[in-house]
Amino acid sequence: MKTVFKLPIIAAAMALLPAAAEAQRTPRTDSAAIGADVGVFRPSEDALDSGLALDGFYEYYTSPRVSLRLGLGWTNPGYEGGGNRNLRYVRIGGDLIHNWEGGTIHPFVGAGLGVYVMEPRHDGDSLADSESKLGGVLLGGIEMFTSNTVSIKAEASYHLISNVDNFGPENPDGFKLTLGLKKYF
């Protein structure tokens, strides 16, 4: 008699397992995430030192493997030997990201375009008018899921930015390494 009751319960549980696993899959089509990164930006121009990099973003998944990321980034590398002189970068951009399913670890690559607003500063004051330049970014990294809705990510990116006209350094390109936290909803 006990077997008669156990068998339907076991069959129902087995039937629901694939649905439960699919419901937990992240990312999924039409899901979104917000996140923040902190890291270091190393300009390719010798006249600039490395600087702190901060980024915030919103990411929308068109499929489980493809997403569109809109972001705002800030870095402020100092001039080499320049005392309190630095070159502030603000990036407003969009990136196309492709990721691969790897269980709790998802490697990803991407590319994007953005407007980089650059302004030379000294002791927090502007030294010249800012310049807005078009730039691109190539990126890659890994995302490590700590739960179904939270992940930690490590990312490397190279920023290719149009040359600056009115103040130095002329070439503002650079390499950035970041660690971040991402929350899905």
Feature names for model-found ranges:
Residues 42-52, 80-86, 165-172:
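Solvent-exposed loop/turn segments connecting transmembrane beta-strands
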Residues 153-155, 159-185:
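Hydrophobic secondary-structure block in the mid-to-C-terminal portion of proteins
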Residues 38-41, 78, 121-125, 162-164:
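Extracytoplasmic loops and strand-loop junctions of Gram-negative outer membrane beta-barrel proteins
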Residues 40-44, 96-100, 162:
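Short, well-ordered turn and helix-capping elements at secondary-structure junctions
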Residues 1-29, 185:
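Cleavable N-terminal export/targeting peptides
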Residues 24, 52-125, 131-139, 144-150, ...:
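Gram-negative (and chloroplast) outer-membrane scaffold detector with strong preference
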